[in-house]
């Protein structure tokens, strides 16, 4: 049976994309491309049989009862987001609590990176999110003609920025801070810096204290396909697990390293010391706490209006 799938091109997915690993019993035509485009194709047109998807947007769609997909416990993208918080150094922001009363920009209010970082700020650092004025817009280049913002209860404040770019507004001082996946072009100008200068240490500390390694994206499958082909989820999980095994094996090679990072093997040792031997786990058992934490973030931030059980999100 021929299926269409779309994934980001990562070390843990590359063996699927290039054909080294195949899905037993199914002919999957894998595609890759910009993740925002992949997500749009999935959520707006439901044109893909298997796809990588934003965890937050998948959760919101499922809670509303409008998602045609169900998830596998496979997480192609995970990321601590402490490093994604940029600030003006002249606004008296020395700690997370100092963000209260400030104007903070972000590309999208509902995406997983923003959800997780706000959840960490509130739950771990005690920041009152409703005391921040959130400004949603494009960061370094114009991407959209319409900026969507959610309807949130008072006193939450979320506004759309349709004229300027958030990076420019941070540089000129019209914003006090910015959540951005990648360093904005204004970094280093006019005192723009990261709130957490040694973010990797702060992220490791967060994991040691909470046991949560945030999930950004999840792999989902069309529900109707799972109903017709109950063996598909297991075949996919096995294939993704094998692709991940190949990626980890490549990281372990020291004789002729596969990556240009000079201390990649040391980074691997460090990751295992902090996160455990299987530092990028698949499966529900190893990820239950992280998933339930992020569902809680979404509920607390009013992105979903009801509790969502793991059984609604993931294949049995």
Regions inferred by a protein language model and the residue ranges of each:
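Secondary-structure end/capping motifs
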Residues: 220, 226-300
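Pocket-lining segment of extracytoplasmic ligand-binding domains
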Residues: 145-251
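Short, glycine-/small- and polar/acidic-enriched structural segments
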Residues: 11-130, 134-137, 141
